[in-house]
Amino acid sequence: TEAPIDLPEGELAGVSCADGRVLVQHLPEAAPAAILLLDAILPLDEGGTATSLAHAGELALDPACIARPEHLVFPGEDGRQAFALYYPPCNPDFAAPPGELPPLVVRSHGGPTGRASPALNLQIQFWTSRGFAVVDVDYAGSTGYGRAYRQLLDRSWGLLDVADCVAAARHLAAIGRVDAARLAIRGGSAGGYTTLCALTFHDLFKAGASWYGVADLEALQRDTHKFESRYLDRLVGPWPDAIEVYRARSPLHHAERLSCPVIFLQGLDDRVVPPNQAETMVAALRAKGLTVEYLAFEGEGHGFRKAATIETALLAEHAFFCRVLGIATAPPED
């Protein structure tokens, strides 16, 4: 028998089942994550129950400041459909001058075969509550749109993911949702690679931020940890037969083409994308006189864990984008 269970709005993940009961992680759009107990051991006509067992703490953010995602479908490479979540600026205490469109931050997710989730992401809300629009791009290769879409990225990493991030920004500018003159892109890990490729091989963005991102595919193939040591064979091409492809798609080998300011944020204990990825790219860009910032964090690996590190990195990135894009910021209150 089946017992229907009324579920709250949001995503469910991390399912664990036993004895007619199910534990799931509940990920709503405007509230902290929670653990739900779903109990279906009831008479069929009564239905089941969903009980919240624990949640990730109180939300220290005014609900009125939470931007809700809009599902966006836009033309990607070669006319195929691509997907994203668009978050407009949201802060009831502030309004843009009449006729002014918001600056845009393009977010390129990691994986690279991960996905953009509509679940509450406080890093996205950090930007939208400060007057930025954010588009979280589910570029070709992202999970959640079927096998064919997922496999588009095979042998095409550094191409289709980049093209879709560029296309998302252009689309939002073309339909009048964002300011075409104030476009930035950011990403971490594989998303940092997509970010650096977008800045190197396209001239659309005015600034970028690479969080422990890849600059040199050849070095990544040599240096990364064992678990992902053959991952690039599928994403880029067989190693070492495709070495010229690796070099052609590595921002470090084409640093002369990158012409906008970039901020790099790196954990010094990172074993997945070692610090030399950021350090060699920073040196190459500084050698050509570009505006570059580099923040290295002791005791941080691949993905920052310490609250102080995350806060420092976000505030530095925000200040960097504001300077580059010519956005005035209010002085801190006493």
State where each predicted segment sits:
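A short beta-strand motif characteristic of beta-propeller blades
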Residues: 2-6
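Conserved beta-propeller blade repeats
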Residues: 8-25, 59-62, 68-71, 123-125, ...
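A flexible loop/linker signature enriched in serine peptidases of the S9 family
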Residues: 9, 26-35, 116, 141
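Short acidic/polar mixed-charge low-complexity motifs
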Residues: 11, 31, 47-49, 78-80, ...
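Active-site-proximal cap/loop segments of hydrolase catalytic domains
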Residues: 139-334
